Amino acid sequence: MGACCSSRRNRSPSLAALAEETEVVLRCLAGRVVDLPGGDEVRIAPDVGRPGQNFGYFKFPGPSRFAYVKFIGRAYALGSGRKFLLYLSRNFQVFGYEDGTGLHMLAKSLHDFLKFKGLSDRDLVVVDSVALTSQLRPLTLPIRSTSDVETLVAEEATTNYTSTENLLGQTQSSTHRPLGVPLSNVKTMGVPPTKPSSQRPRGKGGRPPARLKSIREETVSGMARAREECNSPSEHDRLTSEMTDCDTTRRYPPSFFK
C-alpha cells in the first residue's frame, strides 16, 4: 500500500521572475497614459496593482472551459479608432479583447507589448470567445467611433504621460501631448488678463468693495464645482465598470501575483 499527496506546484524560476517584473511595471504605470510603438496608446488602470482587483473570465467553446484573466487597461489604435481591453493570463501573456472581433494575442509579456509589439499583432485572433465579468456575467461594451476616441485622447492630453523609452523613470511634463493628436484639438481655458494693482477698484480704507468681494466668492465656488466635475468619472471610465467588480468569495483566486 502506498500513499499519495498533492501540493501546490511552484512557479518555475523564469515565470517567477516574469511575475515580479510584471508587477513592478504595473505598479509604476498605474493610472498613466503610455505611448506604444507605432503611435498607438495604452492607459493602465489606476488600481491595477491592488490584489484581487479587475479580474474576469473568457468563455471558450466546450463544456466548462473558462480562462481566468486580469484586466490591466485599455489600448487605442489612434489611426483606425479601434479599442482593446487588455488582459494578462496566468502566464502573464498580454491579450486584447475587441468588441466584435474577439480575443487577440498581442505579446508574450507586458515588457514586449509596451516596448516592441504594441498593437502591431492585433489582427491575430486567437479564438472566438466570450468575455465575462468576475461574476460570470456577459460583458457588454458600446462601440466607440473614431471621433469619440480622438476626443478622449484630447481630454487625456493633460494627464500623466509616460514614454516607453523609460518605463520605470520619471513622469514627463503633463503638457506633452500624445502622438497623433493635433494641438488644435486640445481645448484650453482662457484666463482673463489681470489688471495692474494701480487700476484695481478699491473701497474705503483700501479694502475691496462688497460687490467685488461677492463676485470673488462666486468665482471661487464656481472653480470648486468645476474641479469636482473634472474629478468625477467620465462616461468612458464607466464603460468597463463591470470589469472592476471584485468578487471576494472563495470561488475565485484573489490575485495573479501571490
From Swiss-Prot:
Recorded coiled-coil stretches: none
Pfam families the UniProt entry points to: DUF1314 (PF07013)
Region feature (Disordered): 163-258
Domain of life: Viruses
Residue spans crossing the bilayer: none
Basic and acidic residues biased stretches: 214-240
Biased composition (Polar residues): 163-176
The protein's name: Gene 3 protein
Organism the protein comes from: Equine herpesvirus 1 (strain Kentucky A) (EHV-1)
Lineage: Viruses, Duplodnaviria, Heunggongvirae, Peploviricota, Herviviricetes
